[in-house]
């Protein structure tokens, strides 16, 4: 809640024909003038009250449950189960064709050793799994 909302929700007492400031003896026939007075003269008090209200209304965070650590084997996805340490041909989304021995690097990347990339020999190349369109094993 901000200060303007708090002032709007304040219950301002009417005494006869006049409204009275809840923080001092100031009176006026116009309720808007009283609210303007409260904001200008009693801003510090209002700010503290709003701050206390905001502290009370904050939702308490629940502690997160600790998840068990996953083993390295859990990170190997289906694609690498049959291609790990085998010679494969990999088609990438940018049109490149990579051929070589596939090794699991981590859950997002694979490493291809002794690779041939578009008929160029490369010692090793790391490929993000998201860019792989097709992976074809060349040996059983």
UniProtKB/Swiss-Prot annotation:
Keywords: Metal-binding, Plasmid, Zinc, Zinc-finger. A zinc finger (C2H2-type) spans 21-42. InterPro entries: Znf_C2H2_type. One of its GO terms (molecular function) is zinc ion binding. The keyword Zinc-finger applies. To M.jannaschii MJECL27. This is Uncharacterized protein MJECS06.
């Amino acid at each position: 809640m901000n200060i303007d909302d708090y002032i709007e929700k304040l219950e301002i007492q009417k005494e006869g024909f006049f409204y009275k400031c809840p923080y001092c003896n100031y009176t006026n026939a116009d309720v808007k003038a009283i609210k303007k007075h409260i904001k200008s003269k009693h801003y510090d008090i209002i700010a503290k009250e709003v701050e206390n209200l905001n502290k009370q209304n904050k939702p308490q965070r629940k502690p997160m449950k600790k998840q068990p650590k996953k083993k390295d084997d859990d990170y190997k996805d289906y694609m690498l189960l049959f291609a790990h340490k085998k010679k494969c041909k990999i088609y990438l989304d940018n049109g490149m064709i990579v051929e070589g021995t596939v090794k699991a690097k981590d859950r997002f990347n694979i490493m291809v050793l002794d690779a041939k990339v578009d008929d160029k020999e490369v010692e090793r190349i790391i490929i993000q799994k998201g860019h792989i369109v097709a992976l074809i094993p060349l040996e059983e």
